[in-house]
């Protein structure tokens, strides 16, 4: 019983020390009132670059290693041109343009650049949960897309745009198709939706695990407290019985025996 109490106290000290050392950032909605109770969970900073399973996650809020992200897809294999501007990486790939009936014949060998840009709004610390502050880089080898960040200024400069806006904190993604294959647009929308659903599922799993741990700890502490209360009650009853027995003995014992007990108190104890 005492070993469990000491272990629980040690765990409590470690948890409180960790929470004091980490710099905590509270997530407060813009329309929140001052007297509104604080949220159950708080946001803590994570490393700018870390791995989760077989995925490598890079946080680009502070302009870290965005321009050094693995050179994917390889230029020598897919013959692609990688350009970076305004925190956006755009990958171009040439493929034959479909033949159309026009006044002047167009050769089938002519090629045109097709650029597809994934546009994502810059997350705000006070509105977006911690898992949504880390941008997810979607890599599509078929359509050659490696983009992230705020692409408002870049999208206006591209001749043939294929824009996809993915907001992971609200309703499903809205896809605007200006030119291109509808099948590819549908596949990209499914990919973005699946990614968003995966992030939400991971968040739910983490919350459920934390709730389960909290529930187990709460029940364990309550059980230990009840055991301690029962032990204290038994000891108090035993103490009262001994006091009553001592009082009766003092009243009925002879003065000689009482004097002998008082003189040899240490031996009796």
UniProtKB/Swiss-Prot annotation:
Alphabetized SUPFAM superfamilies for the sequence:
Delta-sleep-inducing peptide immunoreactive peptide (SSF58026)
Lineage top rank: taxon: Eukaryota
GO BP, one example? regulation of transcription by RNA polymerase II
One short Pfam name that applies is TSC22
Q: Provide the family line.
A: Belongs to the TSC-22/Dip/Bun family.
| Name of the protein described by the UniProt record | Protein tsct-1
Natural source organism: Caenorhabditis elegans
Gene coding for it = tsct-1
């Amino acid at each position: 019983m005492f070993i469990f109490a000491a272990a629980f106290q040690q765990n409590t000290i470690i948890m409180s020390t960790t929470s004091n050392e980490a710099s905590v950032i509270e997530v407060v909605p813009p329309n929140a009132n001052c007297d509104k109770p604080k949220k159950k969970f708080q946001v803590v900073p994570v490393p700018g670059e870390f791995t989760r399973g077989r995925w490598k996650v890079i946080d680009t809020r502070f302009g870290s290693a965005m321009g050094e992200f693995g050179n994917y897809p390889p230029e020598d294999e897919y013959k692609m041109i990688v350009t970076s501007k305004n925190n956006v990486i755009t990958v171009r790939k040439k493929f034959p343009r479909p033949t159309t009936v026009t006044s002047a014949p167009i050769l089938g060998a002519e090629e045109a650049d097709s650029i597809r840009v994934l546009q994502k709004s810059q997350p705000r610390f006070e509105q977006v949960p911690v898992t949504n502050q880390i941008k997810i880089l979607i890599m599509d080898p078929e359509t050659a897309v490696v983009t992230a960040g705020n692409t408002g200024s870049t999208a206006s400069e591209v001749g043939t745009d294929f824009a996809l806006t993915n907001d992971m904190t609200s309703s499903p993604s809205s896809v605007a198709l200006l030119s291109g294959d509808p099948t590819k647009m549908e596949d990209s929308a499914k990919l973005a939706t699946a990614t968003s659903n995966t992030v939400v599922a991971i968040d739910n799993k983490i919350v459920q695990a934390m709730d389960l741990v909290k529930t187990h700890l709460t029940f364990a502490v309550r059980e230990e407290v009840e055991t301690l209360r029962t032990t204290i009650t038994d000891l108090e009853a035993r103490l009262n019985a001994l006091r009553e027995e001592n009082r009766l003995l003092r009243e009925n014992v002879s003065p000689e025996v009482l004097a002998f007990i008082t003189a040899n108190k240490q031996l009796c104890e």
